Amino acid sequence: MREDDTHLPTGCGALDELLGGGVERGTVTQLYGPPAAGKTNVALTTAVTTAAAGGLAVYVDTEGLSLARFQQLLEARATDPEAASANVIVSDAHDFDEQAQAVRDTADFADRADLIVVDSVTGFYRLARGGDDTTGDALRQVADQITHLLSLARKHDLAVVVTNQVFTDVDNDSDRARPLGGHTLAHWTGTVLRLDRFRGGTRRATLEKHRAKPDGEHAQFQITDGGIDAASADDY
């Protein structure tokens, strides 16, 4: 599906413009935000959009993917939903060890994949670390997974999307939610996109790191039956 040799479309024009054309090949894009911010919907819509265009998406699911939502997106975005479904390889992980194995196994598909998604890369890390965001063994394992995915992205010129959860940094005299893994994970991701949800359901995506665009740029989007679509500033 090499219509654009450098980016994969997310399925939302506003997000694609924000990201400089879509999700970039050859690097890792991190989506983070609080619950219901739209992380899974952005990741899944990107995967389905890739599959509908004839590309192969590998989706490591640690969150319990809704098959009904998956089917809904296929029917909305693919002219042949059954064929598109065959282009999405879903691997379920139920604990930290299974996640690590699933991430390693993505290498088996890397030579023909266009996109690898891990949703979420830090869910089991949150459980392992308890209430303290430390750089212990659990974080090192997550960092190892990210660097493995980054090496696949660079070697095979594919795109990687990982979703990340948040915590409240009470030690920083702020109630602002911050991404789990902090600077460690940000170091290994080429793009960091923060997602927020506003009253009425409108979401905002804000660039916090990008290899070619300034930090702070943002776009509004909304979640629909067909995935994700642009929203105007008047909607929130």
From Swiss-Prot:
One Pfam family in the UniProt entry: Rad51
Molecular-function annotations in GO: ATP binding; ATP hydrolysis activity; ATP-dependent DNA damage sensor activity; damaged DNA binding
Coiled coil segments of this chain: none
The keyword S-adenosyl-L-methionine is annotated on this UniProt entry: no
InterPro entries: AAA+_ATPase, DNA_recomb/repair_Rad51_C, DNA_repair_and_recomb_RadB, P-loop_NTPase, RecA_ATP-bd
Family matches, as PROSITE patterns: RECA_2 (PS50162)
Keyword flag Ligase: no
Keywords for this protein: ATP-binding, DNA damage, DNA recombination, DNA-binding, Nucleotide-binding
Residue numbers binding ATP: G33, P34, P35, A36, A37, G38, K39, T40
GO biological process: one example: DNA repair
Function: Involved in DNA repair and in homologous recombination. May regulate the cleavage reactions of the branch-structured DNA. Has a very weak ATPase activity that is not stimulated by DNA. Binds DNA but does not promote DNA strands exchange.
Protein family according to the UniProt entry: Belongs to the eukaryotic RecA-like protein family. RadB subfamily.
NCBIfam families recorded: PRK09361.1-1, recomb_radB
Protein name according to UniProt: DNA repair and recombination protein RadB
